[in-house]
Structure formats: C-alpha cells, structure tokens
C-alpha cells in the first residue's frame, strides 16, 4: 500500500516540495491509515489533523473526538477539533444532513489550511482518506441514480488543494495496513446499517461483484480512468467550440448544432452552467433540440428563457419590474440608487418660480395627484 500511495501522490503532484498537510481524520480505519502513512518516512510530511464532531451519534461522536485528540497527543501531531450540531444546522439551511456535514467539514479544513498558509507562506494541501472502494461505491451510486460520464468518473484523486493519497488503494488493503502496523481506530456503528443507500452498495452490491470477479474494483478503477480521460478530451473540444461560436454574450446556433453529439451535449451543459440554469440530461437534450430546430425557446429558472432566433442562441431575462413613487412632496429613494425630489406648485405660482429656478427644471406635468404615480 505504501508504494501505491506514493505512486498516486507522485502521478498527481499531490505534495509539492515544502508543503504542509491538513489531514481530515475521523478516527476510522481509512483516515488513521492515511495519517500514519503521511507521518511515515515514505512521506514524512508536517501534518495538522482536523476532526469534526458532527454531534449526530451522541456518545459515540464524543468517543471519536476523544480518541482522535488522545492519539494526536500521543503521536505529537497538532490537532484542531470542531464541534457542530449538524442536524440543527441542516434544518436551518433546509438541506440534507449528509450534505450539511460535508460542507461543514470542508469549510473547516479550508479555513485551517488558509491560516497555516498565511502563517508559514508554504503551500498547504488538504488530505482526505477516500479509497478505491469509496470511489467504486460512488460510481455505482451515481449509476443507479442516473448520471453523465463525468459522474461515472466518481471521486477525483486531486482537485485544487484537496488530495486523496489512498484513492487507488482498496479498503481491504487499508485494513491490512492497519493490522500490520497495529494502528488503532474506531468504528462508526452506522456503517453496518443498510438503511443508508451507500451502505447497501458497500455491504451487498460490491461483495456480489467480487464473487463474479475478485478483481472487480481494480477493473472499475481502469474503466473510471478511461472515462475520465475521454471526458476531459471531449470537454476541451467543447470549450474550443464555444469560443468559436461566441457572439458577444450569445452563441451561433448553427455552429453549435454542427458539433458531434458528445461535444454538443458538453457545450450545452457549459452554456447552461454559465447561465446558472439546470443542466440535467433532460434539460441538455431540450437545449440541443431548440438549437437543431434553429428557433424556439426553453424555459429556465427565474422566468428566464434560452432562445434561438435568427440563428443566434441567447439568454432572455425578464426586464426589471416597474416601480411606483407616490407623488407626494419630499425626497424619494430610487431602487438601485438615486433619488427623486417631488414639489408641487399651483398654476399661478409656477411661472414665477420657473423664472427664478429655470436651470433646475427640465420636465413638468399637469396631473390629478390622487390618481397618477410615476
């Protein structure tokens, strides 16, 4: 496993010279193996551990926090701990608990990394302990739910500052590493529950695949890499095509429609993404359809529309809503800034006032103040 992790890190340039590492450590076997490996002579990197107590499993969550803190003290590793009532935060934000927990974790990791980088001036990487098994399970989850080629690529080895040195190592290899090196770890009791979709895949689907072929995970890894390489190439072609088809803030529909279907769909997804619109497979197909028909509209969120007219594909947005200002004397603020000053005169006094202040008056109106608004 040491060799695999070292080759993975080198292939993806995970740890540049002089870098520091923020390691996300839950206390489970995967993250403990990663921490041990980062401190091992293979890497021998300066590491700061980050642990998040999500407060979701009562005493078990507190046990994990205490375990990580105690072990880091014994190993002489700096440790940062965050306690967060994720369930309450998820209700407040109106998002799922799992998604909320992920956002809290990565925000904590990134804040810690930013502080370390500012203090040291050295590059900082955030290491998380996803394994090949996690990657395969995620691919199967995406496949069952419905996804694109990008979704089948599953979890990337590296993205920005986030790196995954164990991404080519199976969970069995990690368990063997922990056993050989007597690495202590804790077990999350919820991992054994098939009430969670990912656990059903892990506990039921993947073992069946191994019965078909013991090398199923490695075969899946090769397939995911092939898909990733193809997707990156086709996405690059789509980016180039969009540059050629660009017409100011719009695009030439004919040029987009002439693209090969895999490139056209990726270009459509990129346009929808730039317009902050839904980019589901069905929406991408609808977008490609109006491009092919040379005219038509596609409803987007917020009352907006993608429209093709006279060979140009553009985004139509509803005009700013009208606003009213009551014609009462005084100063009235305008939406977006500015002001209007209203002053009324009777017919007799206005001509005399205009002579004195003629440079200040450009428009006037005769109106019934009880009916007219501007």
Go through each PLM region and give its residues.
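Mid-to-C-terminal catalytic subdomains of enzymes
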Residues: 181-218, 222-225, 356-371
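AMP-forming adenylation/ATP pyrophosphatase catalytic core
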Residues: 2-29, 48-54, 84-86, 104, ...
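Short, well-ordered coil loops that connect the C-terminus of an alpha-helix to the N-terminus
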Residues: 44, 77, 215, 274-277
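Alpha-helix boundary/capping and short turn/kink residues
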Residues: 145, 149, 171, 210-214, ...
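Core alpha/beta nucleotide-donor-binding catalytic domains of modification enzymes
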Residues: 1-207
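Generic structural signal for hydrophobic core residues of well-folded globular domains
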Residues: 143-144, 166, 209, 227, ...
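Electropositive, surface-exposed helix/loop patches at the edges of structured domains
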Residues: 116-129, 219-235
